[in-house]
């Protein structure tokens, strides 16, 4: 936009839009600024959709902002650290089970990155746990990964992820999420509980 002489980029929090007078009020560092406009495009950004289950957000954060990414990074690395300190095999297993919900581009990338971290990057970083034993599970409601991009590309993504050690569950819908894991319902009507300390909603 900097090459557009008639465009202006302004930092601030919009507090009021006056359509009749074609002005926008924004606050920055405690000061309100009024900016006139000829054309106004409102792009508030993307939010996470939990499909009417917003209570899932506490235990399965999304990844739409830098703050979200930092929170997830802390949860993922923290799970390895807690597993290292735990002497309870069941607790370790739960801590080393990472579930990514959603097989779109973000979920595919996230599952691949967690698998890469666990199965390659962190090898030898801990004394009491084998990070290569970490489970990374990717859950998708459709019959293929990357549904909007077609079955061929989805199949290629699935092959790559499986080579990284990602367990892929297709035709699966998450029906509940809590501190200790999540509940998944499959197309055949079966229901399964997955114990996991770290869940990511993508």
Named regions from a protein language model:
Residues 101-104, 142:
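Glycine-rich Rossmann-fold phosphate-binding loop(s) that bind the pyrophosphate
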Residues 111:
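Glycine-rich loop/hinge motif
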Residues 1, 33-34, 192-193:
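Structural alpha-helical scaffold elements that stabilize or flank donor/cofactor-binding regions
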Residues 107-108:
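N-terminal Rossmann-fold NAD(P) dinucleotide-binding loop
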Residues 12-17, 115-202:
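A Rossmann-like FAD-binding core segment of flavoenzymes
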Residues 2, 80, 118, 122:
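Conserved hydrophobic residues forming the short capping helix/wall of the S-adenosyl-L-methionine
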Residues 7-99, 189, 200:
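FAD-binding core/adjacent interface of flavoenzyme oxidoreductases
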Residues 1-7:
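N-terminal glycine-rich phosphate/pyrophosphate-binding loop and immediately adjacent elements
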């Amino acid at each position: 936009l900097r090459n557009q002489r008639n465009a202006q980029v302004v930092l601030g929090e919009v507090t009021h839009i006056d359509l009749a007078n074609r002005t926008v009020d924004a606050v920055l560092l405690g000061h309100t600024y009024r900016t006139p406009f000829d054309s106004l495009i409102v792009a508030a950004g993307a939010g996470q959709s939990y499909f009417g289950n917003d209570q899932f957000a506490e235990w399965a954060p999304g990844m739409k902002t830098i703050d979200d990414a930092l929170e997830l990074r802390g949860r993922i690395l923290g799970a390895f650290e807690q597993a290292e300190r735990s002497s309870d095999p069941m607790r370790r297993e739960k801590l080393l089970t990472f579930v990514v919900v959603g097989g779109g581009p973000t979920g595919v990338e996230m599952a691949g990155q967690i698998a890469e971290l666990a199965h390659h990057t962190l090898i030898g970083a801990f004394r009491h746990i084998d990070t290569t034993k970490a489970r990374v599970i990717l859950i998708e409601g459709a019959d293929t990964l990357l549904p909007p991009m077609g079955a061929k590309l989805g199949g290629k993504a699935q092959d790559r992820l499986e080579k990284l050690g990602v367990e892929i569950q297709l035709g699966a819908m998450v029906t509940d999420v809590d501190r200790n894991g999540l509940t998944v319902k499959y197309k055949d009507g079966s229901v399964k509980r997955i114990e996991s300390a770290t869940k990511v909603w993508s």
